[in-house]
C-alpha cells in the first residue's frame, strides 16, 4: 500500500507537538475534502434539481452520489475566488480575498498583514484545545506554512504547490501510474491520521486537498478504458478516442482522461468514507466535499464562464455535506461561500468566545438541520467577490438574494442578472431594474473601499516591475549563457536558447498588453 505510520512521517518532519489523548470525544470531527478546479456540473449527482443540466451525463461519481443521498447538497455554494491561492487563503481565514489583500495570485501584502488573525485549526482549538488538525495535499498558500496556520500534522513542512501533484520529489519524474495525482497515497495518509485520532479518542479536523482535477490530468488506465467503452457524450471529439499510446502523457484536454480522473477522485473518496464507517465514527463526523474554484473541461453549461472568471462558471462550486443531524437527501439553496467554514465549524465544535471582528464568514450550521428554513444572518445579506486580475479581465461582483451584479473594473461597465431565472447570465437586466443595479453597485463598492481592496492598476504596476526587472533579466541571462554553444551546434543549448527567447518574447508582449490595459483603465476611471 501507499501508507506509512503517521508517527514516522512526523518524526521525519520534526513537527510532533506533544499531543495527548483526551477522554472519549463528544466533540464532532471534521473532514474537509477540497477538489481542485472541479466544476459545478462535473458530478453525476445533480447540484440543483430545478436547473436542467446541473450534472454530468458522462462522468460517474457514485460515492459522492451516495454521500449526497445521505446528506445535503448546497445548490448555491461559491468559492471565495475563481483561482486557487486566494480561495484557499480565504477559506482558511474566514475572510474574503478582498479583505485579505489576496484577491489574485500575489500574496505579498496578505502574508505581512493577515498572519495571526485566526484560522480554522486555531478556531477549533479555541473552541476546545483537544482538537488535532492535519492538512494533506495541495497547500498553495505561499504566505504561510501549515504549522503557522495551526496544523499539527502535514506531509511537507513548507506546504506544497501544483508540482507535487504531477511529479516525485525531484520534480522531474512523473508519479507512478497506480497513484495518479497522488489520489490514493494522500487518501491513505488521511486514513492513517484519522485512525490514530479515533484510537486516541481525540477530536480532529483534517483537510485533504486533492491535486485533481487540476492540470496536468492523469488517471488509472483501467478507468480510462471504462470511459472509452461508454456511449460517446456531446462534449467528445474524435481525438478523444485515439489509442493511449498516440496521446501525449498527461494531456490536459483529453476527455477520457479527465472523466477517468474525476472517477478516480471519487473512488479515493469512497475509500475514505468506508474507512470512517469501519472505525464507527461516522455518526460524529462531518464530511464536506467541495472545490476551490470553478472548472470544467470544454465549458460549464448551463453556467457561463470557467476558472479565472467571476461568472457563475468560475465561482459556483459543488458542495455536499453529511454528518450528525444533517438532513438526508435534501437540497439547500441558501447562498454560502468558502469563508463561512471557519465560523460554521467553530459553532459546531461548541465555541462560545467571540471570534475576531474582521471575519466575513457566518455560520451556516443551522442549514444542516433546517435546510432552506434556516435563517442565516449575513452583514448586508450579500456575498461580495473581488478579482482585480492584472493579466486579464478584472472584475468585482455581488450576489444579494436572486440578483447578481458584475462590474468590469477596467471599463466600469456593469451587468445585472436574476439567477433564479437566468443561471447562464445571458440577459442583462440593469435597464429593467436600475434601482437594484445602483443599490448593489453602491453596496459592493462601499465594502471594497472599507477593506482597502486591491486596485487592479496597482497590481499591474507590480506585475510590470517583475516582468521588466527580475524576470526579464534572468531570461536574458539564460539566453546569453546558451548562445555560444548553440551557435557551435550544441542541440541542447539550441533548445534552451529557443525556450529562453520564446519566454523573452512573451514577457515583452505581456508588458505591452499590461501598459495598454492600464491606460485604458485609467481613462475610464
Range-by-range predicted roles:
Residues 357-358, 452-464:
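Short, flexible loop/turn segments with low-complexity composition
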Residues 449:
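Acidic/polar, glycine-enriched structural segments that form the non-catalytic walls/loops
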Residues 1-4:
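N-terminal secretory signal peptides that target proteins for export/translocation
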Residues 21-409, 414, 423-442, 446, ...:
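Formylglycine-dependent sulfatase
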Residues 7-18:
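Bacterial N-terminal signal peptides
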